[in-house]
Each structure stands twice: as structure tokens, then as C-alpha cells.
Amino acid sequence: MDSASRQHVALIAFPFASHPGNLFAFARALAAAAPDITFSFLTTTFAAATLPPAPPAANLRLCHVADGVPEGGLPPGTTIHGRIGMFLRATPGNFRDGVRAAEEEVGVKVSCVVSDAFLWMTADVAEEIGAQWLPLWTCAPAALLAHVSTDQLRERFGVEKQATAGWADELVDFIPGLSCLRIRDIPDEIVTNWHSDLSILLHRMGNQLTSATAVALNTFDGLDTTIDAALASLFKKTLPIGPLNLLSSPPPLQPGDEKCLSWLDGQEDATVAYVSFGTMVLMPTQSDVSEIAQGLESSGVRFLWSLREEARAGLLPPGFLERTAGRGLVVPWAPQVRVLGHRAVGAFVTHCGWNAVMESVTSGVPMACLPSFADQKTNARMVSAAWGIGEALRGEKVTKEEVVRSMEIVMMGEEGRRMRERIGNLREKAAEAVGPGGSSSENFKSVLEMVRGTAN
């Protein structure tokens, strides 16, 4: 096929937390469905190292872009927010350079730019080269609706923490789709931490997305029809294509994975609480780890806890591992998708990032939510108050008593049984959506048509 008839698509990742992995899963699905198109995946060297180890498709290429880190390396004490700021100051020039380099290497001009929705400036990059722009929102639909409604929320409640404190329990019932959320559940970047680099980025994003031809979403029809309708009224077109975790097979087992899976094999059905807060989350505090440990011990439930070695050392209460050895297992890492799909797991204790929520839903496992930052508070509220598939932390701090209470509700009580029934129904809807003829499958076909330039 000559270069005049070939097509070239650039995918541009927001290189932090779970964002690169989500866009990469999407990229692999696109590459598998369109083997005649070349896909160039643009991300930083650091983020590329976090992607799944399995080799990509022959028509999917990894391309590195500048991350904004000074030549001498990161200054001592640089936080994740500092790294985000450095990266954003390198944009959009690094994207222009990356697209130009990809075009030279492939020998074909880019005709479509698919980006993480966070990166609103990629719309300008696409326009400059005459390509269409398709943003993918990988987080919760409720969080997206909140970000698009930033100006309304700030006008109503202000932006300073001291000003919004008195509104903490006020319902956001004046925005269709967010009526069950309280101000305390809204992402900090909207109403308190408004001057940060990330807040400015997301505010601009909320304004830019309304001009996109379509916005692809990591959700599925039937999860929340009210939010779906609200987003559909704000954007030119919405394309729910999720859950993204169902677009690809679980990663291959790593050395040591069999230990926790074998341990689960020896447990009764739905008797184990799986505890994990992700691999990219900020280091938990000693107080949080200690309170969770005490809560698990006092609750009497069986548990599998994925806790990194550096978080475990010196943070667990003295003697905890010995006292719970008969009914608990603490491991440095666990194959989460496989663990959640195991018959023995009856609850997921999570910070409630959107990936975790989707993996829990598609496994049919109710959640005990201990949110920490970003959209986690929003997700926890939706899980507990809107969908009834989990129990959320009461108050702002993790306590032993809250862990015990959530375990009793999710693992032992009648409400826990109803949660399992509700999340089981959502699991079926998610499977139907990505199945043959399902809504997400059909929307994915629409994305392919956009990528090919054949959409109406």
C-alpha cells in the first residue's frame, strides 16, 4: 500500500497515574481492529515504562515526547504535582515535535489525533495539521460532568477552601446528573485547589471538549442514564465505549502471583475482602495503614491485602501479621483483575479510582470505599448513594471503626447481599455492552469510522 492511501493516527497520552495504560488499552483495541492503519502512541519515557509488558501490535508504535524535566534531573523533593507542572509547561511544543517525528518515521501524515481528554491543547495540534481530534475521557462520567460545570459550581460556592467549608454537605441538585453529590464529593480542583496546574488544565479542558466532534467515554450504557443524558446534552456526540478493562485480556501472571491465587483457592465463596489502593496512588500515611489494619483485625473478616513493601515497613501495627496469619495474607502486589474475579472475594476495599470501580463492577464485587484525592470522592459517593453497590467512608479520615462498619455492611449484612445483587446486574449490562451488537461495541465501530475519516 503506497503512502498516499495509508492512514496514520497519533494517540497522545497524559503520562501520569493510570492514564497512559487506559489510552494504551484503547490504542491496542484500535490497532487490532484496523490492521491497515498505523498508530503512533506518544508518551514520555517514564510513562512508557509503566505500560503492559506484552508486545504491541505490528501497526502500533511507541514514540517518546519530552516530559519537561530539567536536564539535570528532578529537583530534590519534587512532588507528583510538580512533575505534572513541568510536563504541562513542555506542551504543546513536545506534542508538535512528537507528531512531526512520527510522520517522518512512518512516512505518512497524521490524519487523526486521539488524545487523553485532559490534554485539551491537542485540539490545536490536530487543527494545525488538518487532522480531526477525538478525546477519550478515561475517568468517571460524573467527574467529567462536574468539570464541564466548573464555572457554575464556582459561581455558586466560591473557590477558596474556607468559603466552601460551610457548603460541604450542600447537594449539587441544580446540575442535572449530579443531584446526589455534595460539595465535599466534588474534585478539589474545581472548588478549592483552583490555582494548581492541574486545576487550570481541567478547567480549560471542560471548555474545550464542547467543541470536539465526539467524546469517547470509559463507561457503558445503563450504568447511569441521568449522567449519560446530561453529557449528551453538553457535547456534540458522546461515545461510551467501556468498560476499557474489558477491551483486553488480563496481563499475564507474574512470578509470585500464584501465591495469593492459591491462597484464595482455599477460602470459601465471597468470604475474603480484597484490599488495594493501586500502584500509582500516593504513599499511604502511617495513620491510614494502621487504622485499616486495626479495622481488618477487629472485623474478623478474611482478607487479602496488596501493600507495597515500602508502605508496609514500619506502618503496620506491631504483631499484626502474626495475629492475623490464620485468616489474612499481605502481599506486595496482586493480579487485581484475576483476584476480583475469584469466587472467594466478596468485597473490594479501595480508594475508588475509576479503574478500580470498573474492575469491581465487571467482576460483580461490591466496594468499601476509602477515597483520598482526585475524583475518588466523587466515585465513592456514586458507588454508595447513587448505585447502591458499596459503602463509603463517613467523615474525612480513615478510622478503625469505619473499616469495621464497612466490613459489617458489605460482607455480613442484608444490605451487602443487596449490593451484590445490584452490582451483579451492572456486571451483566457491562458484558452486554461490549458483546456482539452491544452499545459499546457499536460505539467502538463509530470511533473506527471517525479514525478512518468515513463517519457521517
Curated annotation (Swiss-Prot):
Its EC number is 2.4.1.-. CDD domains: GT1_Gtf-like (cd03784). GO terms for molecular function: quercetin 3-O-glucosyltransferase activity; quercetin 7-O-glucosyltransferase activity. Belongs to the UDP-glycosyltransferase family. The gene is UGT77B2. An anthocyanidin binds at H19, H147, A374. Gene3D superfamilies: Glycogen Phosphorylase B. The active site is at H19, D116. InterPro entries: UDP_glucos_trans (IPR002213), UDP_glycos_trans_CS (IPR035595). Expressed in young cromes. It catalyses: myricetin + UDP-beta-L-rhamnose = myricetin 3-O-alpha-L-rhamnoside + UDP + H(+). The keyword Transferase applies. It holds the Pfam family UDPGT. Keywords: Glycosyltransferase, Transferase. This is Myricetin 3-O-rhamnosyltransferase UGT77B2. UDP-beta-L-rhamnose binds at T279, A334, H351, N355, E359. It is an enzyme of class 2 (transferase).
